[in-house]
């Protein structure tokens, strides 16, 4: 039987639970921010039969997987549970969990669950088509992936769950609840519900009332890095952590990732290169975009918000290109003992900037209010095999990802007045040295690449450490622990080439969107309700 831990201050390690879209991880860090061990398990979010767009989160199975990861991490680290000073949790944003009056989780969905497309359209028509603008003005979110249409969907289609609902939280809060029995949300993750006021960092209950929904189901709000509770006896027996270990409020994956990268001061900017690419800029005070092109999220740093733009499927597009067209390069890379992307980058480095005018059409710049993309394609190909080949297309894709990022950063600067003087490039994309240099050349900014490129779990561990007094504050610790791998300075000649390429791409992309509007091609992705 697990024993009550009464000396958590003697622990020498911190644990971060990271619930991503495709997997859950338990990561153990020492008090210098060094990663010691990881337990990881993939999970799937399955569609409900006859519910188009649904992506349910399997609460029972996924908790078992989380416990498995915790046990695995402890075993790999070869440390006792008493060595863990504190635990915190982070997760994909937008996903929500519903609880009944007994505190039992009864329903959950993952981040891009799109079942409520009809409800999104219905809500947009409220108050002479101004309801979404009011939601955005208050919360920095549109309705597409917010909790409001999902709750309305439950009221329409699952009234049994809707009427039993007593509390709603995010997925990170659910993991913390399963550990401690305490229910609360933090602003950085709960902000993506579209129900949190950017100024007060608390719930805006009137938005639910305006939608004709119940406003009595909102959890207490606690800031990241504060004490939530302690590991319960039940949780200790399930996952082998020590009962009584402090559980600290965590947050949203992107904001905690920025904390782990030291992006904690006003005007600091980051490009996070994963399956999706996010371009984030810290703002000193809450402000929203009059054109509703970008989302605004609470940072984990109190009083600070982040503008966030998203490039769709950027990393996924690169994987598609590698797997669909580069079987030969994958075999060669395997024989050489290197990553296939490294080989493709080496090939692409011999292609001149501008990639002979090839224009990839994949993700658009972010248009949060009316969010959809053109059909995937390559434009302006040549039939000269010396100029148009796999290396050229690969370089064109890397250049295009940087161009979309630059356009998104320009949109942010236009309404916020905040101009970046450098940026941090992290995530899987930042492993590419050519890609990092292209990003510098396209944006005209110095690009800093950290040693720890996947920093979400580190940011979560920082929250845990601050919560038990290991470190003094979130911002100070994030800056202290980040280490830099390399720096890329922009090449002025390449910058001029990319300025022209960017202007042409923007014009061509608008024509490609028009083909989607005319029903002639199929969008890469459309937001629910369009």
Curated annotation (Swiss-Prot):
Transferase is among the record's keywords:
yes
Where is this protein primarily located?
cytoplasm
Name the catalysed reactions: (S)-4,5-dihydroxypentane-2,3-dione + ATP = (2S)-2-hydroxy-3,4-dioxopentyl phosphate + ADP + H(+)
Asked whether the UniProt record includes Hydrolase among its keywords, one would answer no
What does the UniProt entry say about where the protein is found?
Cytoplasm
Give the transmembrane ranges. Answer: none
Q: Which GO terms describe its cellular component?
A: cytoplasm
For the protein in the UniProt heading, the enzyme class is transferase
Q: Could you tell me the EC number(s) of this protein?
A: 2.7.1.189
Q: Which InterPro entries match?
A: AI-2_kinase, ATPase_NBD, Carb_kinase_FGGY, FGGY_C, FGGY_Carb_Kinase, FGGY_N
Q: From its record, what is one biological process in GO terms?
A: quorum sensing
Q: Which GO terms describe its molecular function?
A: autoinducer-2 kinase activity
Ordered alphabetically, the record's keywords are:
Cytoplasm, Kinase, Transferase
Name the domain of life. Bacteria
Task: State the similarity comment.
Answer: Belongs to the FGGY kinase family.
Function according to Swiss-Prot or TrEMBL = Catalyzes the phosphorylation of autoinducer-2 (AI-2) to phospho-AI-2, which subsequently inactivates the transcriptional regulator LsrR and leads to the transcription of the lsr operon. Phosphorylates the ring-open form of (S)-4,5-dihydroxypentane-2,3-dione (DPD), which is the precursor to all AI-2 signaling molecules, at the C5 position.
Q: What is this protein called?
A: Autoinducer-2 kinase
Q: Which organism is it from?
A: Salmonella typhimurium (strain LT2 / SGSC1412 / ATCC 700720)
Question: What is the phylogenetic placement of the source species in the record?
Answer: Bacteria, Pseudomonadati, Pseudomonadota, Gammaproteobacteria, Enterobacterales
Which gene name belongs to this protein? lsrK
């Amino acid at each position: 039987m697990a024993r009550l831990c009464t000396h958590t201050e003697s622990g020498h390690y911190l644990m971060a639970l990271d619930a991503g879209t495709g997997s859950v991880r338990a990561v153990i860090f020492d008090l210098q921010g060094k990663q010691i061990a990881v337990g990881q398990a993939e999970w799937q979010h399955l569609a409900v039969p006859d519910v188009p767009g649904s992506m349910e989160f399997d609460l029972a199975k996924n908790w078992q997987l989380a416990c498995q990861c915790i046990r695995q991490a402890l075993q790999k680290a070869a440390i006792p549970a008493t060595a863990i000073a504190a635990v915190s949790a982070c997760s994909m944003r937008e996903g929500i969990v519903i609880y009944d009056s007994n505190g039992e989780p009864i329903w959950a969905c993952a981040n891009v669950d799109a079942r409520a497309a009809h409800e999104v359209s219905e809500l947009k028509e409220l108050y002479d088509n101004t309801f979404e603008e009011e939601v955005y003005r208050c919360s920095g979110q549109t309705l597409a992936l917010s909790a409001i249409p999902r709750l309305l969907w439950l009221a329409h289609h699952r009234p049994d769950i809707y009427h039993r609902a007593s509390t709603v939280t995010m997925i990170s809060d659910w993991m913390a609840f399963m550990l401690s029995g305490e229910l609360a949300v933090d602003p950085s993750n709960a902000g993506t519900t579209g129900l949190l006021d950017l100024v007060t960092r608390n719930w805006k209950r009137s938005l639910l009332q305006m939608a004709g929904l119940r406003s009595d189901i909102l959890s207490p709000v606690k800031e990241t890095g504060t004490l939530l509770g302690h590991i319960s006896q039940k949780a200790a027996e399930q996952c082998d952590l020590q009962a009584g270990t402090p559980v600290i409020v965590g947050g949203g994956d992107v904001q905690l990732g920025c904390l782990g990268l030291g992006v904690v001061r006003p005007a600091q900017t980051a490009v996070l290169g994963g399956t999706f690419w996010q371009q984030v800029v810290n703002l000193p005070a809450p402000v929203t975009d009059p054109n509703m092109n970008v989302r605004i999220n609470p940072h984990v740093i109190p009083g600070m918000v982040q503008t966030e733009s998203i490039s769709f499927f950027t990393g996924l597009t690169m994987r598609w290109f590698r797997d669909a067209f580069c079987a030969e390069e994958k075999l060669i890379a395997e024989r050489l003992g290197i990553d296939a992307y490294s080989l493709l980058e080496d090939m692409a480095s011999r292609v001149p900037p501008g990639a002979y005018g090839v224009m990839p059409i994949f993700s658009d710049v972010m248009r949060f209010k009316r969010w959809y993309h053109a059909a995937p394609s390559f434009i302006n190909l040549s039939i000269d095999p010396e100029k148009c080949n796999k290396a050229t297309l690969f370089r064109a894709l890397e250049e295009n990802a940087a161009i979309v990022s630059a356009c998104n950063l320009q949109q942010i600067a236009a309404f916020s007045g905040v101009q970046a003087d450098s940026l941090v490039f992290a995530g899987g994309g930042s492993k590419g040295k050519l890609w990092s240099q292209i990003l510098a050349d396209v944006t005209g900014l110095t690009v800093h690449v950290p040693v720890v490129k996947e920093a979400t779990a580190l940011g979560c561990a920082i929250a845990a450490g601050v919560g038990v007094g290991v470190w003094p504050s979130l911002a100070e610790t994030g800056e202290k622990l980040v280490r830099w791998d390399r720096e890329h300075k922009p090449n002025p000649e390449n910058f001029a080439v990319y300025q022209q390429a960017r202007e042409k791409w923007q014009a061509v992309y608008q024509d490609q969107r028009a083909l989607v509007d005319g029903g002639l091609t199929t969008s890469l992705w459309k937001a629910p309700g369009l």
